[in-house]
């Protein structure tokens, strides 16, 4: 028994140090450390966006919030020459509202909403297979902003029906938006109910 105690203590110390190390890596990580794939299958390096203001959104084609594509594209057109990049990540984790292939999603967005901002490959945003950049975004901005009683009620409803939510920081639904400043800081997280026009001033303040 006495021989087991040092071994157990050593194992616990190692585990704690490992957790601390992993936490430090998360804290020290930059959004520019991440890579992903676009909807054509080509690698996208977030370092290429250094110095830009980013608005990163998980999207879906058959959602009640899908009309927000129009507002996101309008925001992109208004501010892209000043350094804004809107990045869409189609996601099928919420009620199966993004069932199409990457090609079908792109066609839908182009024909129905005139989308020209970059679309990434369809990805998970919660759970064990979540796109790593979303794990980073959620860690940096674990709570979302919403306005008024309507926003509060909508958030409560989405939290009740979303099956992919396991942690408080998890994304509740489609069209959650993360605003990232020019230096890579995750400044704000906007709820699905927040229309692009609602936070246009926040975007402009970053430019």
Question: What feature does the model see in each segment?
Answer:
Residues 7-17:
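Bacterial N-terminal signal peptides
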Residues 1-4:
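Positively charged n-region of N-terminal signal peptides that target proteins for export
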Residues 187-207:
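Non-catalytic, surface beta->alpha helical segment in thiol-disulfide oxidoreductase systems
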Residues 20-47, 67:
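N-terminal "domain-start" segment that seeds a small globular fold
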Residues 83-100, 116-127:
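Thiol-based oxidoreductase modules, predominantly thioredoxin-like and allied folds used
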Residues 114-193:
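Thiol/selenol-based redox catalytic cores and closely related redox-interacting motifs
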Residues 52-53, 61-62, 66-90, 109-113:
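Conserved helix-turn-beta segment immediately C-terminal to the redox Cys motif
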């Amino acid at each position: 028994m006495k021989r087991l105690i040092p071994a157990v203590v050593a194992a616990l110390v190692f585990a704690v140090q490992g957790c601390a190390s992993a936490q430090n890596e998360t804290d020290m990580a930059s959004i520019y450390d991440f890579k992903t794939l676009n909807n054509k299958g080509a690698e996208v390096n977030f370092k290429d966006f250094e110095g830009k203001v980013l608005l990163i959104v998980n999207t879906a084609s058959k959602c009640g919030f899908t009309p927000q594509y129009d507002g996101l594209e309008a925001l992109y057109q208004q501010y892209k020459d000043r350094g804004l990049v809107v990045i869409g990540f189609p996601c099928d984790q919420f009620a199966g509202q993004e069932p199409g292939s990457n090609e079908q999603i792109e066609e839908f967005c182009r024909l129905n909403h005139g989308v020209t901002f970059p679309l990434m490959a369809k990805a998970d945003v919660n759970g064990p297979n979540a796109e790593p950049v979303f794990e980073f975004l959620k860690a940096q901005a674990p709570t979302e902003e919403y306005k008024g009683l309507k926003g509060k009620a909508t958030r409560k409803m989405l939290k009740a029906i979303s099956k992919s939510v396991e942690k408080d920081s998890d994304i509740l639904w489609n069209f959650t938006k993360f605003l990232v400043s020019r230096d890579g800081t995750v400044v704000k997280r906007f709820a699905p109910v927040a229309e692009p026009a609602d936070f246009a001033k926040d975007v402009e303040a970053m430019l």
